[in-house]
Design a protein with these regions (language model features):
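TPR alpha-solenoid repeat register
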Residues: 8, 42, 75-76, 109, ...
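Canonical tetratricopeptide repeat
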Residues: 11, 45, 78-79, 112, ...
């Protein structure tokens, strides 16, 4: 089969997935995967179908296959979400951490990692990922979260520095004001 067959089947799979016709979408994604085993998109589509159908075991299998074919943030994020759904928090933590090695600004992964850091008592492990997410763009929420995590890990001076930066940039930030007041108390 040709690359054109792959593209047609993949596009039809996407269309049927969007329309909620999962059986047809599955058929076309399966055909696309058979046409070109070096592309991860059909496996991501099959994973999405499995999620919609509540079949998390198959979803994890397809996300894993997609990540084997083409490692990246999409399959790793999907794997992390499924692991959370199944209660495998330590595995989810590792998947989201790996996601952030591809894109430190992936906010779904950042937020999930923070939540898992609290659940697993691994906030110290989360700090480098939050610091890496302080790249260009709107980092107010990330900086606030970093300050809160620093406070929770007993690093009050570092938390204070980040809150001062926040309040310097946005003196009306009520969350930063409240957290700063807690530090002062």
């Amino acid at each position: 089969m040709s690359h054109l067959d792959y593209e047609i089947n993949k596009e039809l799979g996407e269309c049927y997935l969007f329309m909620g016709e999962y059986g047809k979408a599955r058929d076309y994604y399966t055909k696309a995967a058979e046409c070109d085993t070096s592309c991860s998109d059909p496996y991501l589509g099959l994973a999405a179908i499995a999620v919609h159908e509540g079949n998390y075991k198959d979803a994890l299998t397809f996300y894993t296959k997609a990540n084997q074919v083409s490692p990246g943030e999409k399959p790793l994020t999907g794997m992390g979400m499924i692991e959370i759904e199944q209660g495998n928090y330590a595995k989810a933590f590792e998947h989201f951490a790996a996601t952030l090695s591809f894109n430190p600004g992936n906010m779904l992964a950042v937020n999930s990692l923070v939540q898992l850091g609290y659940v697993l008592n691994r906030l110290t492990d989360v700090l480098p990922y939050l610091e890496a997410a302080l790249g260009p763009g709107d980092t107010e929420a990330v900086r606030y979260t970093l300050a809160a995590c620093l406070m929770s890990t007993g690093r009050k001076d570092a938390a204070r520095r980040h809150l001062e930066i926040l309040l310097g940039e946005n003196p009306a930030n009520t969350g930063a004001k409240e957290l700063y007041a807690q530090l002062a108390a």
